[in-house]
């Protein structure tokens, strides 16, 4: 809920300090239930071994390298949320040790050239980091956050917000881009007006830092306050948001229609000698929009008033409905994703309809905290083991061919158990979204 100082908040903080990060007031449930107030489901001995042999091993590695930085934030986000939801001190401490090493290196020698990474890679990893910071603060253990993280991340992301040009240089700064899009500016290409994944992360990181400052009793910066307001305005704007008849939600419909990646969106499958055939009403591809499932919670939790909080909470619930009823479909016994978030299929990049479903397995959709989504992940978990080939595994990502960590690479990650672990954690998160 919005953070209004009250006696109840003071009591909550006292109780939180008594439960000290690992000893949750409510222990993880051993039953696979999904009531709205159900806690995280505890791992069996076999499941705990899977977690340790995947996430536990990864957290001993320096994952902010050029090879691993992008994938790590995707793959470890939900296992990290599970650790805190379950109140598992051993797992939380493993993440704390990982971020200790990260902070020491990046604020020191920067041995792996993290600071030279591109904007999306760094921001995605920074978002993973600020989520850790917020989870620590919410769980009553802010002392586990390395001291160097806030002074490193905050000025960098504020600079990106205030000084870096928008994508395609449509505006001189990201800040200006937000306001021009809200004002309905007409661009030479429709996709110039997109609020892209970098924009989502910028606002989410700044919102996280604002929540962290509130939780730790320090004053928000002006940019953090502004970022929360922009996030609200983006989700409130009638120009950008469409509520569907079944209670779902679509963001910026049609904005991508003239982008090259969407040039063949009106084909259901890749055909030889295709000519461009775009769709004017095309929506975000579901793979990239999975990031909104996490970012929308960060945006919501930073809101200072009940009105603004309630609007973004409404969008969260609508996005959960959109995923559960339109995006995620049962196809030949598997839960697969439609190409686009309006529930339609088409050709996107190298994928035909339902072929770009690997994003479901990283589990970010589960962060929406919805009963229906948790049930979907419970059913997907029963599909394992899944093979490391396209013929027997409909989630297999055949299009990503860059060098990857063996735990993240589709050729090896299924056999090593990483994909199963991500789905397992997603199936056991609490149904009520974090507030």
Give short role names for the model-derived ranges.
Residues 62-67, 113-117, 186-197, 276-287:
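Short, solvent-exposed segments of well-ordered alpha helices
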Residues 125, 194-205, 284, 288-291, ...:
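Extended HEAT/HEAT-like alpha-solenoid repeat tracts in very large eukaryotic scaffold/adaptor proteins
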Residues 29-58, 131-181, 205-215, 226-233, ...:
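Terminal, non-catalytic domain-edge segments
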Residues 1-8:
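Bacterial N-terminal signal peptides that target proteins for export
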Residues 52-127:
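N-terminal carbohydrate-binding/catalytic regions of secreted carbohydrate-active enzymes
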Residues 103-112, 181-188, 252-281:
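Acidic/His metal-coordination segments adjacent to aromatic residues that form catalytic metal sites
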Residues 8-17:
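Bacterial N-terminal signal peptides
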